[in-house]
């Protein structure tokens, strides 16, 4: 019985990165409406792909970007601790899915600090892979083409 439980847990853990790649970017763009209260997606040339808030960092290029590295953004203690302990760590689709599902447990896991705090209180209960697929599409370093920015789309 214990072996089947461990096998199931291992299968779920291994499937998480694949789930990130199965997201639908078009659906994710619609779901991003929940995120734009705090976040925007703005290309380096200033083109607004998604106009949004400035409470959270600009998410253009987030997939493949080093953790807590958006220039000029004032990050919270928990995410800064992740970056300090893992200076070469970049956002992967799998990490982003886990983070947007519930930031606090991800911070605790990455810092080994049960007291880790996050400024991001939003928890995404569904469609995380879709939103992350949309973010990847707007992350040239992750293999996304930044297509929306190149076309000068503005929302």
Swiss-Prot record:
GO molecular function annotation: electron transfer activity; heme binding; metal ion binding
InterPro entries: Cyt_c-like_dom, Cyt_c-like_dom_sf, Cyt_c_1A/1B
Propeptide residues per the UniProt entry: 150-155
UniProt keyword annotation of Oxidoreductase present: no
Residue numbers carrying Pyrrolidone carboxylic acid: 21
UniProt-annotated binding residues for heme c: 35, 38-39, 120
Post-translational modification: Binds 1 heme c group covalently per subunit.
Positions of disulphide bridges: none
Signal peptide per UniProt: 1-20
The entry's keywords: Electron transport, Heme, Iron, Metal-binding, Pyrrolidone carboxylic acid, Signal, Transport
Keyword Chaperone: no
Domain of life: Bacteria
PANTHER family in the cross-refs: CYTOCHROME C
Name assigned to this protein: Cytochrome c-550
Organism expressing this protein natively: Paracoccus denitrificans
Gene it is expressed from: cycA
């Amino acid at each position: 019985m214990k072996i089947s439980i461990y096998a199931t847990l291992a299968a779920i853990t291994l499937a998480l990165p694949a789930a990130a790649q199965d997201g639908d970017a078009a659906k994710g763009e619609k779901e991003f409406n929940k995120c734009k209260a705090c976040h925007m997606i703005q290309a380096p040339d200033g083109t607004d792909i998604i106009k949004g808030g400035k409470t959270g960092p600009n998410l253009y290029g987030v997939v493949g970007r080093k953790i807590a590295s958006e220039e000029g953004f004032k990050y919270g203690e928990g995410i800064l601790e992740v970056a300090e302990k893992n200076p070469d760590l970049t956002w992967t689709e799998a990490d982003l899915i886990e983070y947007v599902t519930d930031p606090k447990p991800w911070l605790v896991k990455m810092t080994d600090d049960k007291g880790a705090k996050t400024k991001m209180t939003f928890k995404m209960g569904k469609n995380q892979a879709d939103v992350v697929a949309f973010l990847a599409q707007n992350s040239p370093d992750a293999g996304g083409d930044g297509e929306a920015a190149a076309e000068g789309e503005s929302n």
